[in-house]
Regions:
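A short glycine-rich, Lys/Arg-flanked "PGG" loop and its adjoining helix->strand segment in the class I
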Residues: 17-32
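Core SAM-dependent methyltransferase catalytic element
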Residues: 90-92, 113-136
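Acidic, His/Gly-rich catalytic cores of divalent-metal-dependent hydrolytic chemistry
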Residues: 107-113
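Short alpha-helix
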Residues: 73-97
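A short SAM/SAH-binding and catalytic strip from SAM-dependent methyltransferases
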Residues: 2-17
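Hydrophobic residues in well-ordered beta-strands that form the structural core
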Residues: 5, 35-37, 96
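Generic structural signal for helix capping and beta-alpha/helix-loop junctions
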Residues: 43, 104-106
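Conserved class I S-adenosyl-L-methionine
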Residues: 33-64
């Protein structure tokens, strides 16, 4: 393929290296891999009564489990360097990293979730990250 893209899916993998290696195997030389996921800060900052508090460590690259609609959900905390270094090991070169939040999200007067994706957070740091990498 010339392009492989993933919209908010890569973060669900339990084995990032294997996932990136497989994606690399599907791409032609110089093909692009573009993906988005929650910004790495998202897992360590909580909002309480309009205040942002560090509730975890950015450095903890470990899986964590929480309840969603009464069911356990496990995700893996990954730092930006985890994505970059794993992409590099899979034969990719980083072409672009986007750390932005759209102005509509930042300017909402009413919070649109229970605090995970919130305008309060969006005004202080990006909620998501987009990485574009090229297969070498």
């Amino acid at each position: 393929f010339d392009v492989v893209y993933s919209v908010y899916a890569v973060g669900w993998t339990t084995d990032l290296q294997t996932t990136f290696n497989l994606i690399s195997s599907y791409l032609k030389k110089d093909g692009s891999f573009i993906f988005s996921w929650d910004h790495p800060f998202m897992h360590c900052v909580d909002e309480t009564e309009g205040r942002l508090l560090f509730s975890g460590s950015y450095h903890e690259a470990e899986p964590f489990t929480f309840q969603k609609h009464g069911n356990p959900l496990t995700l893996h905390n990954r730092r930006l360097c985890d994505y970059i270094n794993t992409l590099s090991k899979a034969g990719f070169a980083i072409e672009r990293i986007v750390e932005e939040t759209d102005s509509e999200t930042m300017n909402r007067d009413v919070e649109f979730t229970s605090g995970y994706y919130s305008s309060t957070k969006a005004k202080k740091f990006p909620l998501s990250i987009i990485i574009k990498a090229r297969k070498l």
